[in-house]
Curated annotation (Swiss-Prot):
EC number: 3.6.1.-
Official protein name in the record: HMP-PP phosphatase
Active-site residues (renumbered): 8 (nucleophile)
Function statement: Catalyzes the hydrolysis of 4-amino-2-methyl-5-hydroxymethylpyrimidine pyrophosphate (HMP-PP) to 4-amino-2-methyl-5-hydroxymethylpyrimidine phosphate (HMP-P).
Cofactor section: Mg(2+)
Gene: cof
Keywords for this protein: Hydrolase, Magnesium, Metal-binding
Amino acids binding Mg(2+): 8, 10, 212
Family statement: Belongs to the HAD-like hydrolase superfamily. Cof family.
Amino acid sequence: MARLAAFDMDGTLLMPDHHLGRETIATLSRLRERDITLTFATGRHVLEMRHILGTLSLDAYLITGNGTRIHSLEGDVLHRQDLDPQVADTVMHHAWDTRASMHVFNDNGWFTGQEIPALLQAHVYSGFRYQVIDIKSIPAHQVTKICFCGDHDDLIRLRIQLNEALEERAHLCFSAVDCLEVLPLGGNKGSALAVLSNHLGLSLADCMAFGDAMNDREMLGSVGRGLIMGNAMPQLIAALPHLSVIGHCGNQAVSHFLTHWLDNPHLPYSPE
């Protein structure tokens, strides 16, 4: 039986309205009652995740910024990884040929260059929001990650530009169809989960994980049991064809799977 369960948030644990369902919350509590350690592994900021965690009355480790930070149950930093300052400087100051908006994250929050109210819809549960600022004024040595939000085809073209400019100095991945992330080299949820597992005296074989996007690829592919959401990016399903695909986040599929796993661990699972 798994001893550590890792959950992506958007498109996985959260429903399409960006809230946690009642069944999901109840199932997470059942896992804790079985002494299974929880960690939320997300691209969201730790400041936002602390607020969400506080509303749940659950003990959980936090892997945030797509693996750039790990926080303990008490809120202490267990692991931190920032973008190479030269990479951050290049990304923030270059005039990219794109219509996508740029978003910069550091320990102080989420920063962008203009008001984009539509992006706040994903954060209605917590009330977390961006700060509008001159991006070029942000110190490059304090950047955890940078992401671009926009049309997928535009982001694919931007990824080519970024790869040419950054070469092998950063990790690029899609955390959603409309979001391209620039992360520290070697920084991802999978490597962070390996650090956390080691801290807990566990191996990745002792973990199960759930996700839906390409920023979950390393995590899902490295654990003892990786589960892909039915609403996942097709690229993720294609990249990890050996993993089981469960139901849709809108149907609280993680809760559905875990309820079966807790109650009938020896019976085959069907998402229907």
